[in-house]
Amino acid sequence: MKRAIMTDPEQLRSLEGQQYVVLCPTGPVAAFFDATQEELRAAVPMAPFPTVGHVTLRGFSEARRVGELRNEIRAWAAGIPPIELQVDAVDAFPAPFQIVITRLARTASLVDAYSSLTDRLGATDFSRVGELPLEQWVFHLSLIYGAALSAEEWETLRRGAVRDIPSGPSETVASVEFVWFEGGAEHSETITLGG
């Protein structure tokens, strides 16, 4: 059975009414994520974290049009080949976010998928959350959320975590997850890429 990406009740409340298109690695990238997250959780056991490593391609606020949005994502995914993910570094988003991340390389297939989704959504009126232009987007898997840490605690965590990963693990992902949060719970559908 597929594990939920988010299980923390506070996070679930904050995501209510939102939808996301994410990639969920299951091979070497996922193994790297799990091992790194375990180390970080030992250092700050009270900090919230995603239960499953995932790469967000887009977020939405379309609680009343989930079915219509899902159909749009299915149509987009049908024309997208599998996507290569490669770990580039353990990095961090600074305050006010204070999130330690697994940063990914900008592989051609990952950049193309993000760009084509942007182009497709440009012809719609779906309300998007946190969207940035391709050149500003950092492809990543959030490892641990440190926004509640003091500045000193955060700096200690960040300094101990951040590092380059030369020739980092890689894998090819053949599906996307369409995830929506409704009624205090996470729901998802796996959509195969390329048809």
Segments from the language model and where they lie:
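Basic, often amphipathic N-terminal segments
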Residues: 1-86, 104-167, 185-195
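Short hydrophobic/aromatic beta-strand or adjacent loop that forms the aromatic wall/cage
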Residues: 20, 99, 140, 173-175
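A short small-residue
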Residues: 54, 96-98
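Glycine-rich beta-strand-turn "strand-cap" elements at beta-sheet edges
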Residues: 90-96, 171-187
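Surface-exposed, active-site-proximal loop segments in enzymatic domains
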Residues: 98-104
